[in-house]
Every structure is written in structure tokens, then in C-alpha cells.
């Protein structure tokens, strides 16, 4: 066994690789026997074995570690002994292939026939491990995949199929021969990936030989072959591992999701059952027998057409189905069939372009029908009948769709139209709780699983690196020793013959023949072997072979002659100058601008300018590259990534110039756009984000591959399963019976559908699929893609991005404070400007300053912009980052030097560091005159001397705690509390009105407050200060703000009709304005201008009041109708913003957001740059190509055969019915390109853009259906990079930023107010409950029996089962159920109500008043009461109030019962606990979101109230009233449907809309929108709500999920303590807090894991050393501490935990009994053992004495003489003489007993009386307690 162990300790090269022979096998068997014997011995001696694990670097599939060197060719491909010590006694061997990959095999005979030494098996192994074999299999799989993508395979493909099956069978055969089938480890079926192969092959044979009916379904199994690629590509297995891990972890979330969705679905079922079938049906004409007359303004013609009322109120035409035929099935001459009439679709009201009839409702706030139509429940549900709440399953699907937010705006609008706007609440709850919370929980879980997986791999890599370092150290030491030995030998003059490292088993000679060619191989000397080994190791870390470096030095470094070198140096000086960099950067920006200026239509002149510009820029960049090549030599030039990047782009630009006129290569122009990325060189954020994307691309590369495989598999599955159906049943989904755009008939379209599902849009394509191919199959496939692809893989994608975002990556972006060339150049320019300024000022003042003086004065005034040079002159080691306080001081100095109004820029900070950074050593001459810096004002000195925690940054914007304008918590910033108390006994005082600089400039501002007017003024200011500081004043102002905001909500389109309200509002507006002016003036007087205008919140108030003042003045002057004034009035919508500073919750969030704004803006800019590239590319590809010719009457496009281009269309225009029209959102310029990209990235409105792109031909040509099909790929690529990447970067940046802010606050939550933090901590402490008194068992016998029943666990379980059954009965309800079913369900419900009422009554009976002390019981009670009330009321409501809504809401109470299930499930409780912990923060963000919605809806009402009703805007969803606006904005919060709302607003004039249209009831004219305002409105709202607020929501959930899981994954959670206390209650019913020592064993055995110590536990309890009080009692806390210590182990944190537990307990139990422990369990045991020892010793002593006495008595009785008796008196003597002696005590004649004793030859010799049971002392050990010898010895 020595050999392998030595090898693994110091594996010096390939000698460790020994062939596997029969001897090796025998040795293994021998070792296995020895090991078994050793284990048996250890088991008997109870020695615990440390668990052994296989070495991770020697796992099968990994490459042979470098430390083994290169294996010699003779060991490749043959069985070798296993290197891993773990397998030293297991029958395995390894084989290496040429790539040094390890394959591990079982050494048992394969298939019971082939031993490892058989020729067949060795041959199979050689084939299996060969690289060509796996390559061949890989190629086969890929070819097979190509064949699978054929939609109509040719006849010969069958033979190809057989070939593939044959190859796969051959592969499996080889594997089985080489590995064995399934008996041992490392055999064929022990690898789960092989199960895949096996099942695929079996399926192939099954489908071939057995007729199984639906073949296509089974043939789809072949697709799984694509998964085999995963086994061949190494990185993929890790990702798949992470995927599988995350799926395991998702189980709890999945259960919670399904549970929540079920509850919501039940709610939906109760509320909206049957609602979506309510349609507008034309009211039928009255019939009589002879003639049919229609009593109305219109006439009914027997056989002809009915001219219906086509106009509905609104400005749009709604097309009804106009032709009625009296011979329809429902009308005969004598009867009228009502059912047939209302189910005839001809009588429904359809909107133009809609497949479904218009829905309506009967409640007041639901949708209404046009005149002549009635709302009747009939026909099928919308969307082929698949969108409904009629049964539980459809409701569940609808809610799942709502949760994944796919096309949910449609569901939202349908539901609100049918049921009423009040039900928006239902959607709000589900979107926020269901959608945001659950979906992000999935993200949180996946992210966590990935992070864990990642940590594991990182740890492994680190280990390897360390191992490598150790090996190098060993080699070096070894080499040193050898050299020493050599030196010693040389001194001795002797030569060592042979190998100095001879005794070693694995000597270090490595095969270096593959290194440098021609190097002789000297393996004879160990010395050279080791140095070779070191070289090899070093080389392994180098990228290229050595000859490559030699060659590169010769060819790529150009140093030929001296003049050339001189020239080179000059060029180097020029090219490397910072100004050149600045110039190049400006050129890049200009070039980008030039490219962005392209548009359609463009004049020829403009086009020429752009072309010339492009040539110039190409020239500049080419020149830069050539000069750099000369200056740096290619060798140096190509060492830098940026230069390589430059050279590629320049080359592409030149190629593009050459190919400029070739058709179809316009895309090459887009490569020029990559120049934009050169900005990253000097733009840290862009640089960092590119790095982050780079970092994640490695892992993402693998993930993308997995995603691609998944997409491929599902695309093929879809095509195989549904392709035919799409072709055959196409008429069900398309009126013209042509395949729609989204189908699965061929692979490309199938791929697009799967990709669309990954983007989160699955429901619409699924409806089509269900219509053509049946529901079950489509649901299965689509939901699988959705769950696997979208929820898991895409979340893993996000998790990867988030993981590459760590604070380090952000921090590192500054490159350790070095300045880049750009900053140096700008610094120089600033310096130059400053120099010129100072020189001119000197001239003006008549002083000519020397340059030195100028420099000096600059140094004082603005930090001598020589930061760059300063940095260079400082010694390297002193370029440290300045500490934070210095930066804070810098801020103050900046503010007082009048340099900065706002946070100093990095540059200014650099200059400042230069001035007062103690870490820079620069000699500065002494200043000649005093400067600001030397005489800090009073305020500054204060600030410097303030303690750390009271320092406030100078910019109040970021100031989370104090805001003057919310005076509730105003504190004057400067003074220390102590000073304040001394100076100012009456409390706080106002500050100076003006800053000192102002007073110095204008001395008249100085007021003496000690006398005269000044004193009065001071008194007035103090009075104002008191008023303003008063709480009531603040409350009053808040109330006014709320009222004035509320007043804005009334100004809708009906305001002109409501005269009274209008008048009231006008007056109110004036009153509010006066009040706010008054408040502002008071604050000016109280605080002074200095304080007021240095506070950001006050500025906000000031600006908002200004708006009111201006509109007030305009009203007085009669200019209120002026355009600018009107638009100013819309700014009143900002009034609610004033509430921000007053509500602490919102202010906290806003402060957090403001802190994040810089980084958010940075990322936004980077994203815009990213998108700019796609936008310009879009302009290149699509500008002017989206126009089409349309027939305006039928809204149909002309076919390409009728109209081919713009001129043909214009020739038809004289008919008046034709227009040459553009798609509203297009790529005609970069701005519109951005809008298009935003719609694509949010997946809203992207279909129209994509269709237009795919149909586009050339500029001014009529589009043709899918003529440009592969343009889909532009969108696919953009979605991957522009949407997945950039939008997720936002989440990353925001989360990262909040984490950094938290760090600064010392880990406190940044989204919660102090009050809410208390709630949060209370939630966390839920577990620290005191032991409650258990509810005492009642005395009454019957009550007692009930009590026993109710407290049994079985009772609880039964109730849970009943709740589940009740849930099932609720799910069974459907719309239109038969009367029988209604009655049955009613009765079942009655039974359940009786059961639950019974349970409630039983519990009340048993638990008496204690019933209401448990929260869940109260909940149960409420539910029962509501159920009973519901039963009673349902009849009343149906009889007297015909309000189905009320009735339905009451029925919801039953669903409450389902929630009781939560009690039982621990995993779900954790997740809900995370939600509960997030609530306060989420509430704050919700408030902020509501504020934003409020402001935007007011703004929307004033701008878009009258736009034309089309696409997304109709009679219910519009901006006419406040309620409608809020509904629309809620919809857009998730970015749903914003394209529909934007469309009508983009109508800017006729013929799209009519600017002179009269709007009845108001004086406003026209129904046109304002495109620019509309675009700004929607884009800003989407960015604010979707990107910021929603992402903050995500950040908080991720955070709290981590906290909650940490709580639950810790070995001990609050639940465990709760369980401890629950068990305690049973053992300590009187809550004395003590338990008898005798019951301790039972108590710890009754606990649940992890605290439980199972019986036999006596010894364990003794070793716990628990303190005991008199009466042998133990306190509950002591037991808890001991058990906790047992679980967590003894650590430093333990004491802290103990202290907190004690504090919690003391707080919870003020009555804690004071106790003084007198002993401990361990001491008690010691005492017992000692007592037993003493007893035994004493017994022995007694025994000896009785022996002596006995022998004396014996002798005495025999010979009568002898010495004195040893025991003359005492117990022993008396007893013995009583029993054996004479009456007188020393009689010489023996008694008969004694004779008997003597006669008995037994050994007892009269010792019987001294048995322990007879002696009163010492006491016997307690019965039943046997003391084990081992314990006795150890304890004493």
C-alpha cells in the first residue's frame, strides 16, 4: 500500500501510471479484505471512521492533473491502476486517452464474461476512449438533428433513419462491452445520461417492430438525441447540474405557486363565472303570425336587409353584421326560437377587425352596448372559448397567464368590461402578490442554486491552484537540495554515480521531448528531470509554445536602423499624447452622430455630406491605426485588446468601402457602429458593463448552448407533433385558409414560436395550437417550454448576470484611481483656461503675476488641475486612496469655495486630493496671501469637529433623515447638542438669513438683532419659527397638499357640465395657492434664505408654488386661455410630489432611489449606446420600407399583383379610397428606431413592427407576405442582446447599488422607516416566545374527553383532509351546471359548514376561554361565522336584492378555509415569512408607485382626454376621467398594452384624425393627439415604473428571501425553539420553568430533530453538565442552551447567542424565577460515582474486619485460647457474637451454629450477615442503575 500513497503525496510524473495487471487485481482484492477486517475491528471498538471521498481532480471525465506530467505513449489507451487512493481497495482501473482525459471502469468482468484482460473488452475500451469516436458520434447527432428539422422528409430518409439507429446501437454496444451493463459502479446504466441513449434506441426499435398507433408522438422521442450533445461538451454538464439543482430547490416555490394560483382561481371562479359570455345581441323584432313588423325608426323587411344602427357613441364606426335573413333557423312564420336567435353569431355586435363579439356587463361600471343591442349571456367564450372563468381549470389557466403577464391586458379588459371596473382590485392583488412576488421568488431560488453551485466550483479551482503552488514549492526545494548535494560532491571531488533520487518511488523525470525541439532527453539525472518538470509546469501556464515567442520577436518587432528608431520615437510621442486620444474620442462621437443622422426621406445633398464624412472618419481611424503600428511595433500593438478591436473595425470599414456598391451588403455598414465601443476605453461604466458581459459570456456561452438545445428540441417536437394539424385544420384559425404567421408546419416557424414563448408570449400561439391540434397535447408542450425555458433557464440567465455583478466589479472600474488619457487631457485644458483667466485678471488689477504665482493662486482657487501630474510625481507606494473623511472634508471645502453646487465631480475631487490629501507628498511654496482654505468658517470648523455619526453631507438631496420642508423632523444642521443647550435655553432658534458671502458682498443685509428694529425682526422670526416647527402646522400643510391633489382628480372631461363643482374647484385652487404662498413666506422668515434654498425638498415646494402663482396671475390678467399658460397649468399635476417629503415611508424610498440615480443613469446611457447600434442598423435595413398601399374603405392592403410600388398607389389615389400609408412605429430615423426597439424589448406592439420588417422589399415598394423571412433574426438577436442583457443589467445595477447603500448604512434596510424596522425586527423575533402555559385540561369528565380528542394530532390531520376535500368540491363548480349538481353541491357545502361549525364548537367547549388566545382559532371562527352568514344571506339576497356581486363576494368567505392549509406546510411558511418581512418596504414602494401613477394620470387627463378612440383606447379604457386614467396606467405598470394606448396619440392630423371635431359638452375641439408629448409620457412612465419601481420590488424580494432562507436553513430556526417550548408545556403544565431531573431523559427524547437526544440518553445528558437547583430540578433555559450547543458546536458565537437568548427570554418572562444552582448533572454523577466507590471500599474494609473477627472466633472456638478479639465492641462485634458467639461473649465452647459453619467447607465463613441489603449504611446504588466500567473511570 506504500506505493500509491507515496505517489499521491508527491506524484513526480508519469512513473505513477502503472499498467493494470492480474497482480494489481489480486492486490486490490487483498486490500479490500484487509480493509473489511479493519472496519470490523473499529466497529467493535466503537472508533469512528473519518469519511473518505474520491479526489475531485481525478474524477472520471476530467483531465489528468498537470502534476503527473505527460503520460508516455505506451500507457495511452491501456488499463492503468487507479491513481485515486479512495479506489485503492475497490475494483476499478482507469484508462487515459490522448487528450489526457480520465476514463474509469469497473474491474469486474463485463456481462459476466469479459475480464479487464480480455482482447474484446480492451478493443472496445480503445474505441470508446478515442477522440475520433466521440467526434463521429457528435457529427452523427448533428446530422440527425438536421434531418429531424425536415417538415416533409423525402422517401429515402427512412433508410437514413435506419443508419442512425444502427450507429447509436453500435455506440451502445461498444459502451456495454467496455463497461459492463448494470451490475457494478461505472457500468453502462450507472450513468443517467446513458439511460437517455438506451430509451431512445429502445423506442426506435419499438416503433419499428410493434404497431403502436400514434407513431408521430413516439417518434418525437428521437428528438431527445439532441440532448446527447450535453454529454459530449464538458461545460454543459455543470450548467445542467445547476438547472437540475434549481429545479429541486424550486419544489417549495412551485407548491406555493400552485397553491396561490388555486386560491386565486377559486376566487376568479366565484367572482366571474360565466361573465365572459355576456355579449351585445341585437334586440329581436316582435313577430306575429301574418306580417312581421319592426316597431321602430327602422324597418324590418321580410326578405331583405335590416339597416341597423351602425354608429355607436364615440367617433368611430363600428361595423355590425348587417344582413338579416328572415329564413334563418330561429324565425319561421309562426314561432320564434329565442335560443336559436341569441346563439346565431349574425346577431352579435363585432368591433372592426375583432374575431370575438363585444362583451358587456349589467353593472353600472361595466361595458355597455350600443343602441338597439342588449347584453345577453350567450355563445362561447372569447379566444375560441379558451379564455373564461367557467370552470376551475380554465380559471387556473387564466390566472397562470396573469401571473406570467402574457397578454394579460386583454384578460384585464375583457373581465372589467364584463364585470365592472371595481374588479381592478382583484388584478392589482394578483399582479403584485402573484406575479411580481411568485415569479421573483422563482428567480431568487434559481439565483441561489446557481450561487451555491458556483461557490463549489470556485472552491475546487482554488484548491487546485494551491496544489499546483505546493508542487512547484516541492520541486524547487527538491532542486535546491540536489544542487546542494552536487556542490557538496564537487567539493569532495567525488562524482555520485547513478541516480541521486534513486530511493524515490516516483522520480521526477518528465518527458520533455515535446517541449523545445532538439533538447536532449536526460532522464538519467534526476536533477535535469526536475528542472524540466518545473519548466513544463511553468509552460503549462503559458499560452504559446516557446518557438512561437522567438519567431514573434524576430518578425513583429521592427528595429532596423537609428533614423527609423528616431522617427518611431517622434511618432510615439505624438500618438501617445492624451490630446490625440481626446481627438480620437471626439471623432468617434462625431462619426456616431453622422451615422445617426441618416433618415428617410433624405435629400441628395445631405446624403453626400454623410458619405464624405464617413470617408473622412475612415481615413482618420486608418491613419491612427497605421501610426500606432509604427510607434508600438505590431508585437506591442497587438498585445492590447483595444488595439486588436480597432484593427478589426478599421479593416472591416476598408472592406466595406470596397464592396459599397454590392447589393445586399448594406449590413456591412453596421460594423462601423462597433466603433462606438471604443468609448469604453475612457468611459469606466461602459468598460465595466462590457467586462461584466464578458465575464458572464463564458458561463452564458454554455447556458446559451443549453437554451439552444432546449429550443431546438421543442421546435422539432412541435413540428413533429403539430405540423400536420396546422396544415390540415388551418381554416379553423384563418379565414382565408392560409397558414398564419405563427405556425409549426416547418422548422423555422416552429423555432420562432418556441422563441416567442421564451420571450414570455405563449398564450396566443397556444390558442391556435389548441384549436387545430387538440387541447391536452398543446397545453402540455407549451407549458413545458414556458416553465423549463422561460421560468428556469431565463432566470438562470439573470442569476448569472447578477452573480457577475458584485460590488468588486463596480469598485474595480476606477482602475485603482489611475487617470486615463482623457481625464489628463481635460485636466490640462482646465489648467490652461485657469491660467489664462488668472493672467487676464492680473492684467485687469494692474499686477503682472509670474507664472509661478499664477500656478499658486490656481492651486488655492480650484485645486491646480494638475492632479494627473501630481499623481505621477508621487512615489508609487503613496498613491493610496484617501480615507473617506478626507473626501467629506473636500466636499465642505468645495462648497465654501463656490466651486460646486452639487456633489463634486470625480475630477474636482482629484484636484482636491491634490490639495489636502495627506497621502500625497508634494512640495508647495508657502502661500503669499490668505486663502479660503486657511480660515474655515465657523460652520466648517463645526463640521470638522463633529463626531462621525452626526456628519451630514452637504447636499441635502441625499439626506435621508432631515428635510427642512418637512419640518416634522427639522434640526438646524450646524450645532452640537451640548452647545445648543448652553446658548439657547428656550429651544431651537432660527439661523442666519443669508450666507456670509452675501453679507460680505452687500453689507446692508447685516441686521443687529440686539436692539431696535433688529430686535423686533428677530422676535418676528422666532415667532414664525415656532409656528413652522409646530406639529399642527405640518399636519395642516399635509392635509392641504392632499386636498389640493384630490381636487386635481375632478378636472376630467365632464367638468364643464358640472358647473357647481367647477366653481368650487376654482375657488379652492385660489385658496390652496394662498395657503402655500403663506407657508413659503413663513418658512423664508423662519429659516432664512440660506437654509431654505439649500434644501432640495424646499426647492421642489418653491417651484410647484411658482407654477400656481403664475397661473393665478395669468387668470387675473385674463390670459388663462393662452397656450403656454395652459401647458403650465398641466404642471400642477406635480403638486402631489410635495407629499413626498412629508411621508417618511416614501421619502426613504426616494432617498434610496436618488442614491441610485447616478448608476442608473450611467447604465441607461450605456443601454442607449447599445441600442443606438441596433437603431442605426434598423435605419440602414428598414428606412422607408414599411410603407404600404391600403384601401381606406375596407382597410385591406392591395396585393403586390395589383399595386407594386408608391407611384402605382398614387395613380389610384384620385379615386379617393386609397392611401400610401406608413406603419406608425417604424425605422425612418434613429429616434423612431429607438421607440420601435423599446416596443420590441418590452414585447408590446412588436408584432406589427416585425411583420412590417419581414414583409418589406425595397424603399417605396409595396410589401409582400414574408418575402424577407430571415429579418426575424434581426429581432431575435436584438431581443437576446438588447432586451435580455440590457434590461437585466438594470436589475443587476439597481440591486447592486442598493446593497452598496446598505453597506454604507451598516447593513440597515434602506427602504424602511424606523417604525417599519421595528415591525421587521418583530417579525424576525417571532420565534422568541416564552413557554406558554398549556391550556389546562378541563375538570369536567365530558369536557376532558373532548379536550383529548381535539388536542390529538389525528384530529388536526382529519380536519386538513376535510379542508382539501372542501376545496375539491369548490373546484367542481362550473358555469351552467345542472340543477341536480347545484343541489348536490349545496348539500355538500352544508355538510362541510356543519362539520367545521362542529369543530369550532368542540374546540370552544374543550378549550373554553383559551380558544381565542390562538390566532388560527380566531381565523377559523371568523371563517365559520362568515360561511353561516353567507348561507343565510344568499337566500335573502336572491329574493330581495338582485346583486349577484354582493352574493359572490360573500361566497368567497368559504375560500378562507383553504388558507388554513398553510398552518401545516413548513416550506411554504418560510416563503410567506419572506413576503411578510418584505411587506413594509413593499408598502413604501407601492405608495411611491401610486404617487407616480397619480401624477401621470392627472397629466394624461389634461393632455389625452379627447384623443380618437381606436386600438387601445375605447369607451372604457381612456384618459377621460381620473378612474379610467388610473386603470390605464396600472395596465402599463407592467408595460402591458402601452403600444395600444400610444397608437391613437400618434395621430397628429387628418386623415388619421379630425382637429376640428366638436366634442359634445365641452369647448375643446379635435380628437388628435400630440405625438412628442405622448412618446415622452409613455416612455418616461415605463422607465420609471417598469424599470425602477418594479426592479426595486425584485431587489427587496431577493434580499428578504435570502434572509428568510438563512433563518430557515440555519441548523436551528425559530421553529425549533417553538417546538421546544411546545414540548416543554406538556412536561411543565404549571409553567414553573423547571423540570425534575428524573423526567429529563423522557423530555429530550420527546423533542423533534435537531434538538432531540434519543434514548438511551443518560450518559449524553450527564456529559451536558446541566446546572441543578435544590429539589433536583433543571431550568428550561439551561436545557435549551445545552441542546443548542450540542447542535451548533462550541464556538465564539455561541456566547453571543446565549446572551441574546437570555435577553429575549428575560424580556418575554419578566417573572423569571431567580435560582441558584447548587450542582450540575455532571457533578451529581461524579458524586454518585464517588459514593459508590466509597461504598465499595467500605464494604471491602468491613469484609476484611469480619474475616478477622470470624477467624478469631473460629480459632477461639477450637482452641479456646488466643489473642484478644479484634472486635470487642461495636456493631460488628455485637452482631457476630449475637449470631455466632455465646451469651457471655467469650465462652470457650463453640455454639452449634459455629460448628455448623466450621463444618461447612464453604468459603463464606460466616459472612452472610453482611449482605448489602441487611446493612443500613452505606446505601445501595439506586436499583436498576448499572454503572458501566468505562463511564465510571472516565467520570471520576
UniProtKB/Swiss-Prot annotation:
Known outcome of mutating residue 1313 to M: In PMC; changes the voltage-gated sodium channel activity; increases membrane hyperexcitability at low temperature; decreases channel activation, deactivation, fast inactivation and recovery delay from fast inactivation
Reaction(s) this enzyme catalyzes, per UniProt? Na(+)(in) = Na(+)(out)
Recorded consequence of changing residue 1156 to T:
In PMC, MYOSCN4A and HYPP
Q: What is the effect of changing residue 1537 to S?
A: Found in a patient with variable manifestations of essential tremor; uncertain significance; the channel has a tendency toward faster activation and significantly faster inactivation at near-threshold potentials
Q: At which residues are the II repeats?
A: 560-832
Record's keyword terms, sorted: Cell membrane, Congenital myasthenic syndrome, Disease variant, Disulfide bond, Glycoprotein, Ion channel, Ion transport, Membrane, Phosphoprotein, Repeat, Sodium, Sodium channel, Sodium transport, Transmembrane, Transmembrane helix, Transport, Voltage-gated channel
Resulting phenotype, residue 1132 to Q: In HOKPP2; changes the voltage-gated sodium channel activity; increases membrane hypoexcitability; increases channel activation and both fast and slow channel inactivation
Subunit note = The Nav1.4 voltage-gated sodium channel consists of an ion-conducting alpha subunit SCN4A which is functional on its own and a regulatory beta subunit SCN1B. SCN1B strongly enhances the presence of SCN4A at the cell surface. SCN1B is also required for rapid channel inactivation and recovery after inactivation. It prevents the decrease of channel activity in response to repetitive, high-frequency depolarizations.
The protein in question is named: Sodium channel protein type 4 subunit alpha
